[in-house]
Design a protein with these regions (language model features):
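Helix-to-loop junction immediately C-terminal to a conserved catalytic motif
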Residues: 49
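Conserved ABC ATPase "signature" region
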Residues: 64-65, 101, 105, 112-130
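Short coil-to-helix segment of the ABC ATPase nucleotide-binding domain corresponding to the Q-loop/switch region
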Residues: 93-103
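Conserved ABC ATPase signature
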Residues: 134-142
């Protein structure tokens, strides 16, 4: 379970990345973080993986309060969160559809549900026509 309560992240340069974010993700739920360039997607993920600390607000993952989590416990936290990144973290021997479906197959989600979720997500980000493409056939932003 992931909970973000009134999370704000402002970089030292003064650039605000996130402002007052509230997010609740239940155990077993799949969430896709999509948005325009510069909208804070990467910052949000880095906060959840504790690569960054919030300027204000609270973050919990599996009832662990990230704001106080020690470096020693970080690997255990990160094992509990499945993240698919857009940059070079896709499986090169699988097409885009299979890359997106992979995590859901691991937790044995029903095939019918996997198909509908993957197609809906691809449609949402404008890549439905590229579902058979491999990672090396897409641009960095795709």
């Amino acid at each position: 379970m992931i909970i973000m309560e009134d999370v704000t992240k402002t970089y030292t340069s003064g650039v605000p990345a996130l402002n007052g974010i509230n997010l609740h993700v239940q155990k077993g739920e799949f969430v896709f973080i999509v948005g325009k360039s510069g909208s804070g997607k990467s910052t949000l993920i880095k906060l959840l993986l504790k690569e960054l600390d919030p300027t204000s607000g609270k973050i919990y993952v599996n009832k662990k309060y990230l704001n106080k989590l020690t470096r020693k416990k970080l690997p255990y936290l990160r094992r509990d969160i499945g993240v698919v990144f857009q940059d070079f973290r896709l499986l090169p021997d699988r097409n885009i559809y299979d890359n997106i479906a992979f995590a859901q197959k691991v937790v044995e989600a029903p095939n019918k549900k996997i198909k509908s979720r993957v197609l809906a997500m691809l449609s949402m980000v404008g890549l439905l026509d590229k579902y058979k493409s491999f990672p090396n056939e897409l641009s960095g932003g795709e």
